[in-house]
Amino acid sequence: MKKMMLVMAMALMGAMQVSAQNVKVDDKELIGTWVMESMQWEGEKKTVCGKESGYSQFKFYGADGEYACAELALTKEGKVVVIPHEYGTYTFKDGWYSEMGREAIKDAIVWVDKTTTKGTWMKRHDIWKKVNLPDKVVKYIVDCCKTKNTPADIQQMIKQSMFK
């Protein structure tokens, strides 16, 4: 009898652990502003983003598929530097994620809960938190990312005049 109870308890614990690992969150919860909480390259120490490290990343996911990504650095003088990474579009459906028209990847974003995701980029493991930032801040960072994309006509003129 004790063996049977032990087996049942272990089976129940295993089932509970599996269900805790498979959090189901609606795809639309990705919409909004996300800030990197931590990152860890394989074989290296975990970096906690924020004031102490002076580094973080920002991602914006719009309801219409708009996507913006930037790095944020805090200088020794206390100034924030926004380093635009990219601006374009994203898709996210049933665990399949793509940004900037790249091939979709299954489980590139894994839900921990409604406001936390984890994922791996190359060999870096990231944790992201959904945050409410002032609209003015979000607009500024997204606009910085937009200006990183040089218009096609300007690109062509630069190529013709500087890269002959």
Model-found features: residue ranges?
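Positively charged n-region of N-terminal signal peptides that target proteins for export
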Residues: 1-4, 20-21
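Extracellular/luminal ectodomains and secreted, surface-exposed scaffolds of diverse proteins
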Residues: 88-90
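Lipid interaction determinants
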Residues: 21-85, 96-164
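Sec-dependent N-terminal signal peptides
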Residues: 4-14
